[in-house]
UniProtKB/Swiss-Prot annotation:
It comes from Rickettsia bellii (strain RML369-C). One of its GO terms (biological process) is leucyl-tRNA aminoacylation. A motif ('KMSKS' region) lies at residues 600-604. Its EC number is 6.1.1.4. A motif ('HIGH' region) lies at residues 35-45. GO terms for molecular function: aminoacyl-tRNA deacylase activity; ATP binding; leucine-tRNA ligase activity. Signal peptide: none annotated. This is Leucine--tRNA ligase.
């Protein structure tokens, strides 16, 4: 058994990281984002977990009762795809992966409280979210409607807009199609205002994430008002954030799927083709990127304030049906999208805000004074906005409106491996909730996976049930929850993973909110927003007392590695490649290999570093130390062989230093600078960890190591401070490299464990230097420096500075006219 295995066994036997739900100590809850059990952990994952582990171990040493749990986000498409490939049940693949990944996490020495482990595909977990869903349904926060959805034709499932990347499914890479399907939604929009208003209070979140959430919620204040269609009784209702520019309108733009098209528009082949083209654009981001285009419908609307003015109705590719009303009026002079379209299809550009630029060349989008606008002339844009809305209200055609970019959360997924939605469809009774006594609705074991559609739809018996209300034959809902459902509340379950109800309210009151949540910034507008929404609803259902789940958030950078391709354009693993000179070759067949970009580690591009191989070669501590030392945690880290080798060498030197230290005999020599550095390092390493400057903390500890190393190689050693400094160093390093530091701690003669030892303390008075250096200037130019004793008075400093030979040379016998002293920094002698 090696040192790392030895200490992992001791920690397990001691239940070192299991914590109570009550304590006289202050609590601290640190959590890394719930991982998907993909099968293997690579070194890219290790960085995230290592950051969390340093924080957990440090806060424990600071005297906190620290909750640091782990579990598995185990529903999802990869398990189902593996089941199709291997002709097995997703459960087998998932549980096998969990077992393997749990071993890997334990082998890295992470301080998880495994007694609180959760698994989201366990019926004992998801039965609670099924009940919670029914509570949402009862409150009309969950509903079903037909919706135009993003359909992945390869994975045969619906994708959220956020899961569509450049028009393709985020997992399969297939070109996404648009389809109308009945979908289940959660009314997250009911909470849009609170979600937005609370963002400024998330002061311990990165500004980038707060900004992304604010933009995603996308609050717009404007007006809804109606245009009457010329020669028709129908109207088109538009939403505008700039209704004050109504006199600059030159068209009304509608979404490609606006209902007025089916009702009134004669679909020419050109219109059909344009609609088809628009329907292939998926996600609002894709609409934003697309070149602005439009096609005339043949319809006109009448201007609300001048019946002599008519505006053409244009189908555009930048108006979305699910934002506002699916229709806008276009004012090309003061909106850049409208301007681009107007230029393209030759629409008039009419200026209605004073500008110092030519609106025919580009839209003027700033505020100003209204012109060419009848009763609005001379008003500021803000005054005009209020006035025009008043006029809409007087005419009974419009009102002030707030819109949000945020849409209700579509939670339906047409896949097997997910939590079943607990609803029954009855021809007589409609939608019927599954009774509490019949929860959980579990997935069948006898399923066939042929890669086409949802096996639940095709199961011979599972979906056939009797209606709980009328007892007639009925059908179960065969959609399953989006897997973000499970990860939107799991952090509350850790407070007591054995609770009979969804949460243990008392335990949640103690632990929540999470003090520090650690994960990737890619979750800013999905998981993090959904978790905030769930927490607010759970608060209203009396499951938790908080309304915000995460007090602090830290988003770590990615681990990067070079990519490699062989002569046939196939991706290669790094271990399959060898470098000779400046070229790369395939280890087995000798073929030429092309080195590509340095990118985020990913399975698809095979630029992964296998964790087990690295552990066998260097050990867990060396891996942890490298991923934390080479770059600030919030920045990307490039994996390098030299970096991990350097970390391993440092650990070896620690062991060698320990052997030297214990052989030293006490003496009375004193090195004040070493003593000061010990206290300085304690103070600043603690501050660095608190601020997530972990690489800086490591640099400081290396500096202390070097100082001790230098000291013990002197003829006259300060043994007392060398020994004390080394003991302190081992304590400081423990959160970073826990195995070897526990081992060294024991060899130094300690009978306690480091994992629950107190963090070293420092003496503030020891941080003061006995001397300091001042720059000496003559007439503002540096002429010398001098080391002064801290006890020197101002008069003494001035006198010494004047008499310095280099200063005397430039004074040329003159008396100083003035002496300016900046304490402990600069003295400037003016003559």
């Amino acid at each position: 058994m090696n040192i790392e295995q030895k200490w992992q066994q001791i920690w397990q036997e001691e239940k070192a990281f299991e914590v109570p739900n009550e304590s006289s100590k202050p609590k601290y809850y640190v959590l890394e984002m719930l991982p998907y059990p993909s099968g293997k952990i690579h070194v890219g994952h290790v960085r995230n977990y290592s950051i969390g582990d340093v924080v957990a171990r440090f806060m424990t040493m600071q005297g906190f009762n620290v909750l640091h749990p782990m579990g598995w986000d185990s529903f999802g498409l990869p398990a189902e795809n593996a089941a199709i490939k291997n002709n097995s049940h997703p459960k087998e693949w998932t549980y096998s992966n969990i077992e393997n990944m749990k071993k890997q996490l334990k082998s890295m020495g992470f301080s998880y409280d495994w007694s609180r482990e959760i698994n989201s595909c366990d019926p004992d977990y998801y039965k609670h979210e099924q009940k919670f869903f029914l509570e949402l349904y009862e409150r009309n926060l969950a509903y079903q409607k037909e919706s135009l959805v993003n359909w992945d034709p390869v994975d045969n499932t619906v994708l959220a807009n956020e899961q569509v990347v450049d028009g393709r499914g985020w997992r399969s890479g297939a070109i996404v199609e648009k389809r109308y399907l009945k979908q289940w939604f959660l009314k997250i929009t009911n909470y849009a205002e609170e979600l937005l208003n609370e963002i400024p209070n998330l002061t311990e979140w990165p500004e980038a994430v707060r900004s992304m959430q604010e933009k995603w919620i996308g609050k717009s204040v404007g007006a809804n008002f109606r245009f009457k269609i010329k020669d028709n009784e129908d109207v088109i209702e538009v939403f505008s954030t700039k209704p004050e520019t109504i006199f600059g309108a030159s068209f009304v733009g509608i979404a490609f799927n606006h209902p007025i098209i089916e009702k009134l528009v004669s679909k020419t082949p050109e219109i059909e083709n344009f609609i088809a083209k628009c329907s292939n654009i998926t996600g609002s981001a894709e609409f934003d990127k697309a070149e602005k285009e439009g096609i005339f419908t043949g319809l006109y609307v009448v201007h609300p304030f001048d019946s002599n003015i008519t505006l053409p109705v244009v189908i555009t590719n930048f108006v979305l049906m699910d934002y506002g009303t699916g229709a806008v009026f276009g004012c090309p002079a003061h909106d850049q999208r409208d301007h681009e379209l107007a230029v393209k299809i030759n629409l008039p550009i009419k200026q209605v805000i004073e500008a110092d630029t030519d609106v025919q060349k580009a839209a003027y989008t700033e505020d100003g004074i209204i012109i060419n606008s009848g009763f609005l002339n001379g008003l500021s844009t803000n005054e005009a906005k209020q006035r025009v809305i008043e006029e809409f209200e007087k005419l009974g055609i419009g009102k002030r409106t707030i819109n949000y970019r945020l849409k209700d959360w579509g939670i339906s997924r047409q896949r097997f491996w997910g939590c079943p939605i607990p609803i029954i469809h009855c021809d007589s009774c409609g939608l019927v909730p599954v009774p509490d006594s019949d929860l959980p609705v579990t997935l069948p074991d006898d399923v066939k996976f042929d890669g086409h559609g949802n096996p639940l739809d095709n199961h011979p018996t599972w979906k056939h049930v009797n209606c709980p209300k009328c007892s007639k034959p009925a059908i179960r809902e065969t959609d399953t929850f989006d897997t973000f459902f499970e990860s939107s509340w799991y952090f509350t379950r850790y407070c007591n993973s054995q609770a009979l109800e969804m949460t243990d309210k008392k335990a949640c009151d103690y632990w929540l909110p999470v003090d520090k949540y650690i994960g990737g910034i890619e979750h800013a507008v999905m998981h993090l927003l959904y978790a905030r929404f769930f927490t607010k609803v759970m608060n209203e259902q009396d499951y938790v007392s908080v309304r915000e789940p995460f007090k602090g958030l830290f988003t770590q950078g990615m681990v990067l590695h070079a990519t490699y391709k062989d002569e046939h354009n196939n991706w290669l693993y790094p271990e399959e490649v060898i470098k000779k000179g400046n070229e790369f070759f395939h280890k087995e067949n000798g073929g030429l290999v092309t080195q590509g970009r340095i990118e985020k580690m990913s399975k698809s591009k095979k630029n992964l570093i296998d964790l087990e191989t690295m552990q066998q070669q260097y050990g867990a501590d060396a891996i942890r130390f490298f991923v934390l030392s080479d770059s600030p945690p919030e920045k990307d880290l490039e994996w390098s062989a030299s970096g991990i080798e350097g970390s391993a060498r440092f650990i070896n030197k620690l062991e060698q230093m320990q052997e030297t230290i214990i052989k030293l005999s006490d003496n009375k020599n004193t090195n004040k600078e070493l003593k000061r550095l010990i206290h300085f390092t304690i103070k600043h390493v603690a501050e660095d960890i608190k601020h997530f400057a972990l690489n800086r903390a490591i640099a400081r500890m290396r500096e202390l190591f070097n100082a001790i190393s230098s000291e013990i190689n002197k003829e006259e050693i300060d043994v007392q401070n060398a020994k004390h400094g080394f003991n302190v160093l081992i304590q400081l390093l423990n959160p970073f490299i826990p195995h070897i530091t526990e081992e060294i701690w024991q060899k130094l003669g300690h009978k306690t464990f480091l994992y629950n030892a107190a963090f070293p303390t420092f003496d503030e008075s020891m941080l003061e230097l006995d001397t300091y250096v001042i720059a000496v200037q003559v007439n503002g130019k540096l002429r010398d420096t001098y080391e002064f004793n801290t006890s020197a008075s101002e008069d003494e400093i001035k006198q010494i500075a004047i008499n310095l030979p280099k200063v005397q040379k430039f004074l040329e016998g003159k008396e100083p006219k003035k002496i300016i002293l900046v304490p402990k920094k600069i003295i400037n002698i003016i003559c």
